[in-house]
């Protein structure tokens, strides 16, 4: 039991009330962040967070903890840079050590096309607030002495974009710090409480049916990861979401400090070092949509082959454990946030492989939308209605792995 859990054990864990001003379904990072910001920024504390398992027990506790802002479209760069800056202040704001560590993230280019893409990424990042430059191979070698610039003779390192403020933070500490901050203000967090239906009157949501009984609400927000289409269907809403498994694995301790996060868009892979010195690696989503949390040996083989081409020192490491989460992917590889066509039903979803890095900004912006009834300018491009208006936020090149 960590210090968060020890302290939270002493909090009151009341039974669900019959009604709340706001009910948030999903007790992961996005749901807890919205509750935290409703309470701390807007004084709205008659809020319930419903979690069918335990706090952070879903994808918020399965991600690889990378924070970055080096996206490929202006709207995304602004949003994720804002979230990155909120992360930088979150330890001071919550009074909790979140193990936030600024490392920088390299996106390697292996071809002429890759060089053009990473140069363009650096330019658009700088134009919209993210600190990113393009680096030549010799500059990359200074940052990552372990890298093989020949790429094993198959994937030569031709350059990279470098997002200086790329970072990591401990996911469970982020989840529990937000939960603690919300609960201190009076928010109710109900673990082991599953949403089994949405209560409606006509086209207006009036509450949530749970396995512990009905709970009425002025506003219901879905912050579900994985089974969001099922919950949305209960509200009469069809979402353009497909859910795919995403695998990762971690090795034993590597004694030297491997400082940056290294990613390759061409190889669809990335690696960072944990606080314990382990090498943490991930790759692209599984192609077949599924809710399965099973991991496969083929993933280890395929990813290891790609990573060893760039970082041959890892051939002496051993795999300690492997796991799988699930990702809700939208057609344009961008999130879906804000109001829906169903009255009083808000949604934050489509976070794919990039949900952890968005937790502070997503919660802040969703809280503002709920508190004011207006869509904040920052998330207006990410409304669900963009698909009907044929205004996609296409950013597949930035969001395939992490």
Where are these regions (language model features)?
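Glycine-rich FAD pyrophosphate-binding loop
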Residues: 39-60
């Amino acid at each position: 039991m960590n210090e968060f859990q020890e302290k939270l054990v002493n909090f009151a864990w009341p039974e669900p009330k019959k009604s709340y001003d706001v009910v948030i379904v999903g007790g992961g990072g996005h749901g807890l962040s919205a509750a935290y910001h409703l309470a701390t920024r807007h004084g709205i504390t008659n809020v319930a967070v419903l979690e069918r398992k335990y706090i952070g027990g879903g994808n918020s506790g399965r991600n690889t903890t990378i924070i970055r802002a080096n996206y490929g479209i202006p709207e995304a760069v602004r949003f994720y840079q804002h979230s990155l800056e909120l992360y930088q202040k979150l330890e001071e704001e919550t009074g909790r050590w979140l193990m936030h560590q600024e490392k920088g993230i390299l996106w390697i280019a292996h071809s002429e096309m890759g060089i053009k893409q990473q140069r363009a990424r650096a330019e658009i990042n700088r134009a919209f607030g993210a600190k990113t430059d393009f680096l030549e191979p010799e500059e990359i070698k200074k940052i990552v002495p372990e890298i093989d610039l020949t790429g094993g003779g198959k994937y030569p390192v031709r350059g990279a974009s470098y997002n200086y403020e790329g970072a990591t933070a401990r996911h469970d500490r982020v989840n529990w710090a937000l939960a603690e901050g919300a609960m201190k203000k009076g928010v109710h967090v109900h673990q082991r409480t599953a949403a089994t239906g949405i209560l409606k009157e006509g086209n207006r949501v009036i509450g949530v049916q749970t396995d512990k009984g009905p709970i009425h609400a002025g506003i219901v927000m879905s912050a579900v990861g994985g089974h969001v289409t099922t919950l949305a269907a209960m509200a009469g809403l069809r979402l353009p979401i497909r859910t795919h498994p995403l695998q990762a694995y971690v090795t034993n301790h590597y004694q030297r400090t491997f400082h940056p996060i290294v990613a390759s868009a061409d190889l669809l892979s990335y690696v960072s070092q944990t606080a314990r010195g382990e090498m943490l690696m991930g790759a692209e989503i599984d192609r077949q949509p599924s809710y399965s949390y099973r991991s496969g040996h083929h993933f280890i083989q395929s990813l290891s082959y790609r990573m060893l081409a760039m970082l041959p020192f890892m051939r002496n490491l051993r795999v300690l454990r492997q796991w799988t989460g699930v990702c809700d992917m939208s057609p344009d590889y961008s999130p879906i946030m804000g109001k829906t066509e169903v009255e009083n039903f808000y949604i934050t979803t489509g976070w794919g492989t990039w949900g952890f890095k968005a937790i502070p900004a997503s919660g802040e912006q969703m809280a503002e939308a709920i508190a004011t009834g207006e869509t904040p300018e920052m998330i207006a491009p990410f409304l669900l209605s963009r698909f009907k208006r044929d205004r996609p936020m296409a950013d597949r090149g930035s969001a395939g792995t992490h």
